[in-house]
Amino acid sequence: MDSSNAIFKSFLGKAPEWYKICIIAFLVINPLIYFFISPFVAGWALVAEFIFTLSMALKCYPLQPGGLLAIEAVFIGMTSAHHVKEEIMANFEVILLLMFMVAGIYFMKQLLLYVFTKLLIVIHSKKILSLAFCLSATFLSAFLDALTVIAVIISVGTGFYGVYHKVASGNSFEDSTDISNDEKIITNKEILEQFRAFLRSLLMHAAVGSALGGVMTMVGEPQNLIIAGQAEWGFVEFLLRVLPVSLPVLICGVITCLLLEHFKIFGYGARLPRRVWGVLARYNLLKEQRMTQQDRVKMGIQALAGIWLVVGLALHLADVGIIGLTIIIICTAFCGITDEHAIGRSFQEPMPFTALIVVFFTVVAVIVDLKLFEPIISYVLSADPHSQLALFYVFNGLLSMISDNVFVGTVYINEAKTALESAIISREQFDLIAVAINTGTNLPSVATPNGQAAFLFLLTSPFAPLIRLSYGKMLYMALPYTIVLSIIGFLSLEFLLPPLTELMSNWGWIITR
């Protein structure tokens, strides 16, 4: 084997050859487009290529191919290293969240697995169980960040999967085995596939639930805080102003959840196999029998840490990541986890994704520097006031499907604020536009993992390949929710928001500044 073959073989490891060739082609083509055709076209090509690397997440983790494309983009001048740093610092809260909050949830896994195992064993109806997961995620994400909620659900799902996988592989609950290795599973393969389908559906219901809750409050999503800040709204006012859109969407989202389970379409409807239920019930019974006073105290500490988590985030007592760090300290200190290697394991899951997010911010910097969204923004602001709400919603939704909704929301609200300060739009129109931007970035963005950081985290988590949740599968399973949420959001924005906002203003519930 000559050196060139050796380099090609080691390049991107076990990724398919056609995929490696694609990435090399992108790296060759991008500078040519940038220098000889158009920087604008090159920018959109980079966005499309980055989306491609995300869609192939199960073939190769997107950090390496996406990172190479991002490095080249900076090198050829599509953006600067300084601007990348500015984007990272502007979104530093998200990085802290990924580093510390997800690791903090790791130390609450014992309590979460106990509670959700009870839920799984007690609730036999798949419809009710799906509804419970969806509404739990909705409620939690209204007060916590949606990414934190998904981290909780992933932690629980991994626990369930690990318990059954060990037994199906012929091991006991206590054995330490590789749950990604199916070689020892011979007779239980069909049951395992059904269990995977069951977990996929629960996870997607919860993921959409996190978006339903995230749109409702100013702490639900990072961009909500930015929008609330620009509009000068408090927690209650934000909730009331968005309610004419968020409430009908929530009701229709819940109905969609039940209908999908009833008709068993779009990958939903898989029931928990009876044998798996038996294993989980046996595991739960064994755990309860072996539970010592010390175990109960540990779960009590984790419960108190959970209460602090909800209160701290709901009242915004500190940045999300800082609260996550306090969770790590409290849980490890009072549960006796002082070994650095044991603590280090909690960071194994979030760190690759944190690195990927930084690469993503590089792409965002390219979008800003090359003004890729500027033609769309100019078109929307030049439209007549009656059409502006619909256009803001539609274009926010479309761009949020391919780009980060935090970025899209921030760009649009800043442009709307500039238009207000320039007297292009009235204050009343600005308030309505702010709601359109909030709902436009949060609702249609469930269509793809690109738009919501929580969805992207789920797709690139180690749990996704275990349950065979690919990019295409996520698109397919999110499709009915995307259609319902987007249409109901649009209709509510057009026909309910203006009259109900005026009504609440007349009642004195909200004020026009």
UniProtKB/Swiss-Prot annotation:
Task: Give the main localization category.
Answer: membrane
**What superkingdom heads the lineage?**
Bacteria
User: What chemistry does it catalyse, as a reaction equation?
Assistant: 2 Na(+)(in) + 3 H(+)(out) = 2 Na(+)(out) + 3 H(+)(in)
Q: Which GO terms describe its cellular component?
A: plasma membrane
Q: What are the UniProt keywords, alphabetically?
A: Antiport, Cell inner membrane, Cell membrane, Ion transport, Membrane, Sodium, Sodium transport, Transmembrane, Transmembrane helix, Transport
A GO term for molecular function? sodium:proton antiporter activity
User: What HAMAP family does UniProt report for this protein, alphabetically?
Assistant: NhaB
Give the similarity note.
Belongs to the NhaB Na(+)/H(+) (TC 2.A.34) antiporter family.
| Protein name (Swiss-Prot/TrEMBL) | Na(+)/H(+) antiporter NhaB
The protein's gene is named nhaB
